[in-house]
């Protein structure tokens, strides 16, 4: 769906990073000592996802696992609430594994998820658009942070 929208709207996707999916959990979570977490391991715990709004942007969800059915789901609107519930409820979310302890603190950790999928992280922009000097600076910093320069 997203590929079709990119093509039909004269957009370009620039891939920055390919990530294996990771589970974000509290460092005191019962699964925190595992090197690799399975979907089955996660069944007893609440799955925290971002609310996608009224226009149903399900297909743009950063949580590609939103297509899977977990028995306990909680929708949140912001990162702070999500991380508070990850800690307070032994919940989890799934993302790229890129996490910054300076921004998020040291209580949240990322563990690889045992699933044969990848996540393509990138930037969508209008074709023939030239980034401003500040946008170029930001992109360079982002690529450096992702260690792909």
Task: Give the location of each predicted region.
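A local structural motif
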Residues: 64-74, 107-108
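Secondary-structure junction motif
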Residues: 45-68, 131-136
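Flexible hinge/capping segments at coil-to-helix
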Residues: 11-21, 25-47, 51
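Structural motif corresponding to alpha-helix initiation and N-cap regions
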Residues: 9-10, 36, 76-79
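Short beta-strand-to-loop elements that line the ligand-binding cleft
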Residues: 3-4, 49, 69-78
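Short helix-loop capping/hinge motifs at secondary-structure junctions, enriched
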Residues: 28-38, 115-117, 128-134
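Beta-alpha-beta core module
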Residues: 8-15, 19-20, 81-129
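Extended ligand-binding regions for polar small-molecule ligands
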Residues: 40, 120, 124-149
């Amino acid at each position: 769906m997203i590929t079709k929208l990119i093509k039909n709207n004269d957009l370009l996707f620039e891939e920055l990073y390919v990530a294996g999916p990771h589970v974000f959990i509290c460092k005191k979570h019962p699964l925190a000592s595992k090197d690799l977490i399975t979907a089955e391991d996660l069944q007893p715990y609440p799955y925290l996802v971002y609310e996608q709004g009224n226009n149903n942007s399900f297909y743009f969800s950063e949580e590609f696992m939103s297509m899977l059915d977990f028995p306990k789901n909680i929708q949140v609107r912001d990162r702070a609430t999500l991380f508070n519930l990850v800690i307070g409820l032994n919940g989890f979310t799934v993302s790229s594994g890129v996490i910054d302890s300076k921004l998020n603190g040291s209580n949240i950790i990322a563990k690889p998820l045992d699933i044969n999928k990848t996540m393509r992280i990138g930037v969508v922009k209008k074709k023939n658009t030239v980034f401003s000097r500040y946008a170029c600076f930001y992109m360079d910093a982002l690529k450096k942070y992702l260690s792909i320069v």
